[in-house]
Amino acid sequence: MAGGEAGVTLGQPHLSRQDLTTLDVTKLTPLSHEVISRQATINIGTIGHVAHGKSTVVKAISGVHTVRFKNELERNITIKLGYANAKIYQLDDPSCPRPECYRSCGSSMPDEFPTDIPGTKGNFRLVRHVSFVDCPGHDILMATMLNGAAVMDAALLLIAGNESCPQPQTSEHLAAIEIMKLKHILILQNKIDLVKERQAKEQYEQILAFVQGTVAEGAPIIPISAQLKYNIEVVCEYIVKKIPVPPRDFTSEPRLIVIRSFDVNKPGCEVDDLKGGVAGGSILKGVLKVGQETEVRPGIVSKDSEGKLMCKSIFSKIVSLFAEHNDLQYAAPGGLIGVGTKIDPTLCRADRMVGQILGAVGALPEIFTELEISYFLLRRLLGVRTEGDKKAAKVQKLSKNEVLMVNIGSLSTGGRVSAVKADLGKIVLTNPVCTEVGEKIALSRRVEKHWRLIGWGQIRRGVTIKPTVDDD
C-alpha cells in the first residue's frame, strides 16, 4: 500500500477508492462499483485439448500472457494454472450496434473512457470484471485442471477449427466440468482463419453432435480467431449476457481456497527486508480485510512417533491484498486474490500451500484423514485415443487397497480404498484435507502411466483430526 491513512487505498488513484472505516459488507454486491473497479467477481475457466488456443484466447481478451514459466514457453503448453483478469466495458450510446459496443481491457485500466468508434458518442463503462483460470489441456496435467475447476463459475470450451472434434482431452474436460456442476458454458470454435467455410460448417455439426446430452448442450458456439482477435468482442458480449454473476455470500466468515502460493523474496535479500509468503486463491464466501487475523488449515502436516498424521494450523495476519496489480483494502468472493501474510515464506514457496484453506480464526471446517463417500463411476475411460472405431476401455469397479488420486477443492492427494460396498467407499488419504461433508470430489486412476478421470463422489462422513496448538 502506498502509505497514507490506514484503511484507505491510495495505490492506483484512477480506480474506485476503498475505505475500511466506512465498509458495510451487507451493502456489497458482486457488481458494486468499489469492488469491480479493483478486483474480478466471477471466475471463468478455459478448457479444451492441448494447443487448441486456451491461453491465446485469454491473452486476446485480457492482454495478459498467462504462460509465465520458461519450460512452458519453450514447449508452448500451459503447465501450472495461468490466470489473468479482464475488465469488460459497454458503450452507453444506444445507437452503437452490437457487438462493437463491447470492449475488454486489462484489470488496471480506468473504469470508463471515451469512445473511439467513428459516429458514436458517450463513454465505455465498466460492466464486468472477470478472472480467467487458464487450465492446461495436456493429458498428464489433468490434476491441475481439476484443481482449477474447483474455483470456476463458468467455462469457455475451446475447440480448434482445424482438427476433428472431439479430441481426447476435450471430452475428459467436459466430463470434469459436469462433475463440478458448471452450468454456464460458451463454446469457442477457434482458429477459424485456418479453415475454409465448408470445413467450419462441418465441424460446427460435429460440435453439436458432441455436446448433445452433456451439460454443454444448447451452449452458444462462437467462431473466433484468437490470434487475429476476430469476434473477441462477441465473446465479451456473451460473457455479459449469457453468464450470470453468481450470488455471493458477503456476510459469513471469510474462506479462501488456495490455488497458488509463492515466496516473493529475491535471493540474497537482507533479513530485515524479508516479506511473508503470498497465497493466491479465490474467496468462496465472506470478505477478507487488510489487518485481519487468519488461520490456515490443515497447516503444517507431520507424523508423530507412531506414524499418525498430525496437523498444526498456521496463524497469521493479512498484510496486503491485491488483485493482479491493484491494491485492495478488502477482497470479496470471486476472482483470484493475492493475500500477503506474515507466514514464513519457505512454507509458501513453489505452490507448497496449494489445497489449503485460509480464513477467519476458528471458523474453518474440519480436517479429514479418512473419507466415506458415495461415488459414481464413468462407464468408459475418457481422454484416451482409440484406434479406429474401437470403444474406449470400460472403467473397472473400485477394488480394496487400490490407490486413487483424489481431488478435493484445489488439493490433489493420494487415497487408498480401504472398503467398498455398492456405491459407497472408504478412502484413507495420504494428506489430510480441510473440507466439509457434502463436498464433491473427483477420482482418478492410474491407467498406462497416466492419471485418468474415472468418476466422482460426495463426502458423507469421515475421520477427523484436531489441529495441535503450540503451548508457548
Curated annotation (Swiss-Prot):
Tissues showing expression: Specifically expressed in testis at the mRNA level.
Gene3D superfamilies per UniProt: P-loop containing nucleotide triphosphate hydrolases, Translation factors
Keyword line? Acetylation, GTP-binding, Hydrolase, Initiation factor, Nucleotide-binding, Phosphoprotein, Protein biosynthesis
A Pfam family of this chain: GTP_EFTU
Q: Where is the stretch described as G4?
A: 190-193
PTM annotation (Phosphoserine): residues: 16
Residue ranges, annotated region (G5)? 225-227
Q: Enumerate the InterPro entries for this protein.
A: EFTu-like_2 (IPR004161), eIF2G (IPR050543), eIF2g_C (IPR015256), eIF2g_dom_2 (IPR044127), eIF2g_GTP-bd (IPR044128), P-loop_NTPase (IPR027417), T_Tr_GTP-bd_dom (IPR000795), Transl_B-barrel_sf (IPR009000)
The record places domain tr-type G at 39-248
User: Which domain of life does the protein's organism represent?
Assistant: Eukaryota
Residues that hold GTP according to the record: 51-56, 190-193, 225-227
Family to which the UniProt record says this protein belongs: Belongs to the TRAFAC class translation factor GTPase superfamily. Classic translation factor GTPase family. EIF2G subfamily.
Q: What name does this protein carry?
A: Eukaryotic translation initiation factor 2 subunit 3B
Name the gene that codes for it.
EIF2S3B
